[in-house]
């Protein structure tokens, strides 16, 4: 096998051999040379198992090759011949349509994800026997269909968290509403238990809904990273990513030997929430400066350069001091001025300059929390946010077009 295959691709020989034996087929006894072109790009992952197996059977004339020119085939093989899900099914489907293929054969779990692409018949298969019989015209596969637009719009308002659950904090809610309307970055400073994380988790519920074009772009990123759930189609809600403060620089911005999207790209068109901001490594925070300006991240390697979109809304929270009770109305702070200053200096000035709204949060009194009256709902706030956007959601829906979607 030539053409810069990685170890996973090289190991496909054993998986293919076992899968074919289980289904009653044998590998050709002669030496086989497989050239994976272009030779200067490294091939990675196990998604080549199924096309390699089918290609070898066709080359040895064990199966018919008449249909193969019309179909792109991708999938990982298990030792028993079953087909496992792969990463990047949606970008693969888009590429298949661009290259003029009429059909795409993928693992059953990836079929709905790929089927959002129009003018392309997508077939989900669960084992290699189904593929062989389909190619030999002994078995018909049913194309997977997805009602893309109906499903997309039906799930746009189904949120787990709602601002109606938040008691008090009207000034913070107003700040979050302004941030949502303008796409501004925001930092909340307050004592532990003042509701910073609770309100941040509810921010996606008041952001304007995704357009179909934004959803396609967001779904492609999550597909490449392998973050889509099984049997998923388009992402219908804005992403909310909240990495732990121990995250590495590569995990935040993306990279690795085979560059993958990082948290800032997974938060594209959504929210990146950094809880306890000063606890993050200084180098991790500093790499956010360029993506916050350019709205994309460039990952450079010796052989290639990859651009990932990173247009996210940064929301951060932090305590005002190491003990957390500086300026607290009832609890005393035990930190000296030097400790407070050292704690605040963990966040650089250039990064703070990129955070448009900085607000202090005061804990809500018990009497306010115990009230029966609910706060304003996310749906009501969201309507005001949509109206405040330069281009309303109604205008977006009337003009959104994406030639790839069903």
Predicted feature locations:
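Peripheral, non-AAA+ core regions of ATP-driven protein-machinery
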Residues: 1-187, 191-194
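P-loop NTPase nucleotide-binding/switch module
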Residues: 140-178, 213-264
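Walker A/P-loop
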Residues: 189-225
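AAA+/SF3 P-loop NTPase mechanochemical coupling elements
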Residues: 259-260, 265-269, 300-319, 330-331, ...
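A short helix-turn-beta junction within AAA+ P-loop NTPase domains corresponding to the substrate/partner-engaging
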Residues: 331-361
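Conserved small/polar residues in nucleotide/adenosyl-binding loops
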Residues: 394-401
């Amino acid at each position: 096998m030539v053409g810069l295959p990685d170890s996973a691709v090289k190991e496909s020989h054993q998986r293919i051999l076992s899968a074919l034996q289980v289904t009653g087929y044998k590998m050709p006894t002669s030496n086989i040379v497989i050239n994976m072109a272009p030779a200067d790009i490294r091939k990675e992952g196990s998604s080549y198992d199924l096309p390699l197996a089918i290609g070898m059977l066709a080359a040895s004339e064990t199966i018919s090759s008449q249909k193969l020119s019309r179909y792109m085939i991708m999938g990982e093989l298990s030792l028993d011949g079953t087909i496992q899900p792969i990463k990047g099914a949606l970008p693969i489907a888009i590429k298949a349509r661009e290259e003029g293929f009429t059909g795409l054969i993928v693992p059953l779990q990836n079929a709905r994800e790929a089927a959002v692409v129009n003018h392309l018949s997508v077939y989900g298969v669960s084992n290699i026997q189904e593929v062989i019989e389909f190619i030999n015209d002994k078995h018909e596969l049913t194309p997977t269909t997805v009602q893309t637009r109906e499903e997309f719009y039906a799930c746009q308002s189904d949120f787990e968290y709602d601002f109606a659950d938040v008691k008090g904090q009207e000034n913070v809610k107003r700040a979050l509403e302004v941030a949502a309307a303008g796409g501004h970055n925001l930092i909340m400073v307050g004592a532990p238990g003042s509701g910073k994380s609770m309100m941040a988790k509810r921010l996606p519920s008041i952001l304007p809904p995704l357009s179909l074009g934004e959803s396609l772009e967001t779904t492609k990123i999550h597909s490449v990273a392998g973050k889509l759930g099984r049997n998923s189609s388009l992402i219908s809600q804005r992403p909310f990513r909240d990495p732990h403060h121990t995250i590495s620089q590569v995990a935040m911005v993306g990279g690795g030997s085979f560059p993958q999207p990082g948290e800032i790209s997974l938060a594209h068109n959504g929210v990146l929430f950094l809880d306890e901001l000063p606890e993050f490594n200084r180098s991790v925070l500093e790499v956010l400066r360029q993506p916050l300006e350019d709205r994309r991240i460039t990952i450079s390697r010796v052989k290639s350069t990859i651009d990932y979109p990173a247009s996210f809304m940064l929301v951060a929270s932090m305590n005002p001091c190491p003990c957390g009770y500086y300026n607290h109305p009832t609890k005393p702070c035990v930190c000296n001025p030097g400790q407070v200053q050292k704690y605040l200096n963990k966040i650089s000035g250039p990064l703070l300059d990129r955070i448009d709204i900085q607000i202090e949060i005061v804990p809500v009194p018990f009497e306010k929390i115990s009230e029966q009256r609910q706060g304003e709902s996310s749906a009501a706030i969201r309507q005001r946010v949509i109206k405040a956007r330069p281009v309303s959601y109604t205008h977006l829906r009337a003009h959104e077009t994406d030639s790839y979607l069903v």
